[in-house]
């Protein structure tokens, strides 16, 4: 009888020990780190990172909502390659590329991107006879059945849809004709320029809808920065962050002041980080209007997209262009296509000799 009780007691103690040991070996809960939300400037004509090469144009790596997006590719493939390597960016892990428009200072680096990631998806604006490829229904031209076959297009039997070539054969390009949500919370705005010199040019801008509001990345803003922001407000009535080229480099001071005040007072943009073709006078005006909500976005800068991205920027010191920035910016501007839109008046405005 005592042996039976002793056996039962031993079994009970063993069970308690086993249960307690199981409890102590349960894995402790772990918290999943939030996905990165940041923008790194890979191509521009001003900046303080001595490891990178300045050139006129724009490219930025956008890492947000779990996606890695290359927005534009700059003016020179070799320069983009050097800058990408300097920042340790792996272009083989892109989710997709966005080409804002067809100008060379935004698309010339694509050849390098394709050399390391030949099958990456590329979004580009759809334009008739555009460099990214296009098509038209053959009914767009008038026919004359009285002509002999040798005088008729396609011997009088054209295809229903005429497809046109691209400068990037074999690339995985998807053409965007209208504002389109390409993946949940990420939308490409498609607008057309009405400005002299770029009339009918179609441009894409990138919007990411976040809990803090819209993050808006623009390439050159040929359709007008105010028009692009107004379109973004249809996605979310709050613009949290705006960066890229505002195309005020050719504008006179009254226009610059009007746009700066509109972005601040009318559209109520939280934070602003202008670059590329925004222009030196516009940098100054926007700093004055936005104060500590203006972020320096020179070449090599990484901007963290948080509720207060100013605190997370890795750029210290002055917000504006220093003397070296200004000299390089003006020199590269003088060589760019942006000068050709309004001629000598731009040279005077930019202070280029």
Residue ranges and their predicted role:
Residues 1-8:
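Bacterial N-terminal signal peptides that target proteins for export
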Residues 19-21:
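C-terminal motif of bacterial Sec signal peptides marking the signal peptidase cleavage site
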Residues 38-87, 199-217:
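Conserved beta-strand hairpin/beta-sheet module of binuclear metal-dependent hydrolase folds
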Residues 62, 72, 84, 101, ...:
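Divalent metal-coordination and catalytic microenvironments
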Residues 78-123, 127, 233-243, 247:
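Active-site metal-binding motif and surrounding structural segment of the metallo-beta-lactamase
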Residues 106, 121, 205, 211-302:
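Cap/insert and terminal regions of metallo-dependent hydrolase folds
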Residues 128-203, 290, 295-308:
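Metallo-beta-lactamase
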Residues 169, 262-334, 339-341, 346:
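Binuclear metal-ion centers of metallo-dependent hydrolases, dominated by the metallo-beta-lactamase
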């Amino acid at each position: 009888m005592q042996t039976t009780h002793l056996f039962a007691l031993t079994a009970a103690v063993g069970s308690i020990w086993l249960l307690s040991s199981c409890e102590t070996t349960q894995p402790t809960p772990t918290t999943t780190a939030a996905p990165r939300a940041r923008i790194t400037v890979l191509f521009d004509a001003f900046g303080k990172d001595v490891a990178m090469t300045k050139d006129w144009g724009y490219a930025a790596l956008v890492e947000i909502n779990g996606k890695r997006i290359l927005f534009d590719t700059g003016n020179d493939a070799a320069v983009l390659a050097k800058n990408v390597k300097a920042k340790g960016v792996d272009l083989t892990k892109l989710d997709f590329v966005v080409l804002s428009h067809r100008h060379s200072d935004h698309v010339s680096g694509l050849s390098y991107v394709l050399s390391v990631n030949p099958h990456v998806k590329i979004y580009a604006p759809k334009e008739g006879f555009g460099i990214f490829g296009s098509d038209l229904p053959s009914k767009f031209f008038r026919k004359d059945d009285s002509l002999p076959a040798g005088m008729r297009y396609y011997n009088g039997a054209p295809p229903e849809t005429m497809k046109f070539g691209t400068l990037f054969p074999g690339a995985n390009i998807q053409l965007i004709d209208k504002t389109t949500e390409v993946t949940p919370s990420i939308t490409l705005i498609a607008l057309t320029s009405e400005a002299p010199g770029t009339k009918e040019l179609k441009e894409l801008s990138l919007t990411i809808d976040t809990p803090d509001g819209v993050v808006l990345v623009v390439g050159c803003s040929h359709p007008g920065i105010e028009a692009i922001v107004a379109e973004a407000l249809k996605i979310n009535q709050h613009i949290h962050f705006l960066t890229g080229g505002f195309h005020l480099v050719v504008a006179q001071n009254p226009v610059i002041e009007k746009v700066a005040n509109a972005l601040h007072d009318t559209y109520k943009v939280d934070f602003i980080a202008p670059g590329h073709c925004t222009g030196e006078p516009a940098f100054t005006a926007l700093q004055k209007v936005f104060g500590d909500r203006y972020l320096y976005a020179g070449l090599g800068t990484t901007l963290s997209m948080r509720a207060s991205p100013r605190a997370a920027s890795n750029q210290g010191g002055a917000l504006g262009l220093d003397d070296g920035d200004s000299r390089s910016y003006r020199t590269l501007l003088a060589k760019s296509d942006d000068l050709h839109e309004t001629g000598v008046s731009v040279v005077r405005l930019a202070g280029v000799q």
